[in-house]
Design a protein with these regions (language model features):
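Residue-level marker of beta-strand positions
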Residues: 27, 60, 82-83, 110, ...
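Mid-domain Rossmann-like dinucleotide-binding core that forms the NAD(H)/NADP(H) cofactor-binding site
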Residues: 126-187
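Glycine-rich phosphate-binding loop and adjacent beta-alpha segment
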Residues: 200-258, 298-301
Length: 301
């Protein structure tokens, strides 16, 4: 099958990659239709994020169930042909793993995942919309920590900041401000800051009120320098986030697909769709933070 595989020398486009083997843990075979390029994928490709060698990259995807480890057409309430995505954080007998980082991912014609990780999607999600489920779920994560806080800022001039801002609006958080420049941050001004650019931790702490909350949205592996005295004296809390509810993310995307106001404007979020063989151009475009989300189309359907 076609796949993008990580090697020490970079990304290798293969046309003869072996099909995934189903096991008792990775028990569902999914035919991938669309997959999105994430900042994590870029970091892995640039060797800034550690990842297992010789794995298929990618973790944002949608597709159809193609088979089960038991050889039947159904298993645990799932059926061959169901349109699905998956939570890329999978739990197996080898521990917690992330698709495209510790185990084979979605930049391929097929992916094997645990049935517990599947998220069922409506048929019209068999498009870039379905591959966008994981980013929306990730953008939901910080919002569960901001209730009751008056002044909330999302900082960043990048795709994830733009998405998080739109998801916050879709969830009814009208009081959230998006800031894209450091010089626009006011000292002791915010109750909460959601960061999407990890290089400016001290600036965020300075802009928070005493007792404020800093939510870490980015997943950088680069070391960050902080002045702990300021954090201690201002009694700042730091909160990490991973994912919100994938079901809620699906509802947000469905609402945007049906033109519901105050949801997501995918025209400002979705960029071009590339064939897997055009991966070099796709990754180059995706590496520019202000550019829209870039997708691969894997299936001819």
């Amino acid at each position: 099958m076609k796949a993008l595989v990580l090697h020490d020398s970079g990304i290798d486009y293969q046309t003869d990659r072996e099909m995934p083997r189903l096991t008792s843990c990775f028990d569902v075979l999914v035919e991938v239709h669309f997959a999105g390029i994430c900042r994590t994928d870029i970091g892995i490709a640039e060797r800034n994020i550690p990842a297992k060698a010789n794995i298929v990259m990618g973790h944002e995807f949608c597709g159809r169930i193609a088979g089960f480890v038991n050889g039947d057409d159904e298993m645990e309430g799932w059926h061959v042909g169901d349109v699905v995505s998956a939570n890329p954080m999978v739990f197996s007998d080898k521990g917690d793993m992330m698709c495209g980082k510790e185990c084979d991912g979605a930049f391929a014609e097929y992916i094997a995942v645990p049935h517990q990780a599947l998220i069922k999607l409506p048929p019209y999600f068999l498009s870039p919309l379905g591959a966008y489920l994981e980013p929306v779920a990730a953008a939901l994560a910080p919002l569960k920590h901001i209730d009751g806080r008056d002044r909330v800022c999302i900082f960043g001039d990048n795709r994830i900041a733009a998405l998080t801002s739109q998801v916050a609006r879709a969830m009814g958080h009208q009081h959230i401000e998006r800031v894209t420049r450091l010089d626009a941050l006011e000292k002791d001004h915010y109750d909460c800051i959601i960061e999407t650019e990890p290089a400016h931790i001290d600036a965020y702490v300075d802009a928070l009120k005493p007792g404020g909350l800093l939510i870490l949205k980015s997943r950088s592996f680069a070391p960050s320098t902080i002045i702990s005295n300021t954090i201690a004296m201002k009694e700042i809390c730091i909160q990490g986030t991973r994912y919100g509810d994938f079901g809620v993310a699906s509802h947000i995307l469905a609402a945007s697909a049906h033109g519901v106001k105050h949801t997501l404007d995918t025209s400002t979020l979705f960029g071009p769709v590339y064939e897997l063989s055009d991966y070099e151009k796709a990754f180059t475009e995706a590496s520019l933070p202000r550019n829209k989300k870039i997708f691969f189309k894997l299936c001819a359907e």
